[in-house]
A protein has these predicted regions:
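Structured, soluble regulatory/oligomerization domains located on the cytosolic or IMS-facing side
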Residues: 9-15, 19-164
Length: 164
């Protein structure tokens, strides 16, 4: 790690501020500073986010069960085409990927999986917002809609209670 790198050490995420002979100072996201003995840093797993060459855009859409299979297919194709045409989205043989991945209690799950050419979080967040807004528009244009947690309760007359 180097001064300025954004890393994760034992669940603490922050920027490396100083590397000394005996300890390293990391400023966490809440602005607190943690001094860590270098002997401990040498023994634990450190994730250095500053070395990323791309950032992952992975989101799951919860679609209403009323969504038709035609709408699902059209939506998956539209999102894939949008991502394929976006200048900051990485394209290769298997990515970007848009697939139905399962069925929840109240929704069908569609996963969007793509890498974005961004190495800094503020840049990624701007691109992520742009992609998310476009995907919202594509969902609505397809005739599909987002699901929200819900339950359906069916009330019926009990056959035994009505026969007595």
């Amino acid at each position: 790690i180097r001064v300025g790198d954004f890393c994760d050490y034992a669940g603490i995420q922050g920027h490396v501020e100083h590397i000394g002979l005996r300890s390293t100072r990391i400023r966490a996201l809440d602005r607190t500073v943690t001094s860590v003995p270098n002997s401990l840093l040498a023994k634990v797993h450190i994730t250095n986010y500053a070395l990323r060459d791309q950032m992952l855009f992975r989101h799951t859409l919860d679609l209403r069960y009323e969504t038709t299979t035609a709408q699902i297919g059209d939506l998956a194709n539209a999102i894939t085409a949008y991502l394929d045409g976006h200048p900051k989205v990485v394209r290769n043989v298997s990515l970007p990927r848009v697939r139905v991945i399962g069925f929840g209690d109240w929704s069908m799950k569609m996963e969007i999986y793509a890498y974005v050419n961004a190495t800094e979080l503020p840049v990624f967040l701007i691109i992520q917002q742009e992609l998310a807004i476009a995907i919202i528009d594509l969902v609505r244009q397809s005739g599909a809609d987002f699901a929200f947690p819900s339950q359906t309760v069916y009330l019926t007359k009990d056959a035994l209670a009505s026969s007595g």
